[in-house]
Amino acid sequence: MKKSLIALAFGTLGLGIAEFTMMGILPYVATDLGISIPVAGHFISAYALGVCFGAPMLLLARKRPLKQILLVLMALMIVGNICASMAPNYWVLLLGRFVSGLPHGAYFGVASIVAGKLADKGKSSEAVSIMIAGMTVANLFGVPLGTSLSHTLSWRATFLLVGAWGLITLYYIWRWVPQVEGLKDTGFKGQFRFLKKPAPWLILGATALGNGGVFCWYSYITPLLTEVSGFSAESITALMVLAGFGMVVGNLVSGRMS
């Protein structure tokens, strides 16, 4: 396996933990900051808002070298998560989560292009799947680890760990990922030509509904399990592993079905 693909997968792993770890630590954050769990849910929304703003902003940097864009995106992830780890109040943590979300969608887009270009002939899909595997590992191991850290140490340690992982990823992207040629620049308007066909709208709609359904329950999974279902706080880590395993199986099954 090429080291460059491993470096890219490191990035998706860090972003996956940054995105989903808040679900497992929501009660700890709410208690520490003196806010309700529904208000703490805003931190999940702030990350999602960052994703929405960050991906389109990539259009402004479409003429920059792809490796340079990846490094900047990792730097944003580091800053956002370190900011979150030191947040003294609701507003600073909200800002940290928003900044953490900015590189998410853009990184997956750029890293997919880079992975495809680094792949051997006829193996671009395999290369992209290796890159995306970081997200799978995040759901299966990273998020439960973050939940366990928050239970035993502090929720701040979880975000600090993600920030440190971002530093490691930044180094290996700089070291292992070569400069690759970007896609042909079709101009700002050219980026949206695909929306003239109905198929992309169907895909976007299905994705929005699917993710909306998942986040409705997964965002508040910890209080639902402890306060409604009666599970102990100590069992949450194991249950998060089980949820992550379900996501892995779902990805594998849907991949074969498609």
What are these regions (language model features)?
Residues 34, 86-92, 230:
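Helix-breaking motifs and short loop linkers at transmembrane-helix boundaries and internal kinks
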Residues 96-134:
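Cytoplasmic helix-loop-helix junction between adjacent transmembrane helices
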Residues 53-91:
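Conserved MFS/SLC helix-loop-helix module at the cytosolic interface between two early adjacent transmembrane helices
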Residues 90-92, 121-122, 126-175, 220, ...:
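Helix-loop-helix hairpin linking two adjacent transmembrane segments in secondary transporters
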Residues 4-40, 55, 217-222:
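Extracytoplasmic
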Residues 176-204:
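Juxtamembrane intracellular "pre-TM" segments in multi-pass secondary transporters
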Residues 47-49, 136-137, 241-245:
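Short hydrophobic/small-residue motifs within alpha-helical transmembrane segments
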Residues 89-97, 202-203:
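Short hydrophobic/alpha-helical segments at membrane-entry points of transmembrane helices
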